[in-house]
Amino acid sequence: MNLFIMLTMSSITVSIVVALNLLTAKTSPDPEKLSPYECGFDPLGSARLPLSIRFFMVGILFLLFDLEIAILLPLTWAIHTLNPLKTITWAIIIFLFLFIGLAYEWLQGGLEWAE
């Protein structure tokens, strides 16, 4: 019986909220809202537009540092293992490896946006 009352009250509440939204919502369609938007590219234009290598490089660097964070996040729990010195050593090696890669990319000009 309690389950039935809960389901009924939930359905009534949802119906009231949806009805109020439909009655009070202001709609103002304009060409910008009605046109599809796909990451800054015109979806009705040519699908074979060249991709900037700069965006690609920034995406790859983002993935690398995202992976670094995913690897280093469990470090706080891993320090409490039997051999914390080994854990810290591996974390420093991973961090230095990625830092050297970032420095190399920076020195090669891969992070420069201006020509």
Curated annotation (Swiss-Prot):
Q: Name one GO cellular component term.
A: mitochondrial membrane
Catalytic activity, per the record? Answer: a ubiquinone + NADH + 5 H(+)(in) = a ubiquinol + NAD(+) + 4 H(+)(out)
Q: Which UniProt keywords apply?
A: Electron transport, Membrane, Mitochondrion, NAD, Respiratory chain, Translocase, Transmembrane, Transmembrane helix, Transport, Ubiquinone
The UniProt transmembrane annotation reads 3-23, 55-75, 87-107
* Entry's Gene Ontology molecular function annotations: NADH dehydrogenase (ubiquinone) activity
Stored Pfam families: Oxidored_q4
Q: What is this protein called?
A: NADH-ubiquinone oxidoreductase chain 3
Which organism is the protein's source? Alligator mississippiensis (American alligator)
Q: What EC number(s) has UniProt assigned to this enzyme?
A: 7.1.1.2
What domain of life does the UniProt record list for this protein's source? Eukaryota
Q: Does the keyword Chloroplast apply?
A: no
Which family does the record assign?
Belongs to the complex I subunit 3 family.
Q: How does it sit in the membrane?
A: Multi-pass membrane protein
Compartments it resides in: Mitochondrion membrane
Functional note:
Core subunit of the mitochondrial membrane respiratory chain NADH dehydrogenase (Complex I) that is believed to belong to the minimal assembly required for catalysis. Complex I functions in the transfer of electrons from NADH to the respiratory chain. The immediate electron acceptor for the enzyme is believed to be ubiquinone.
Q: What class of enzyme is it?
A: translocase
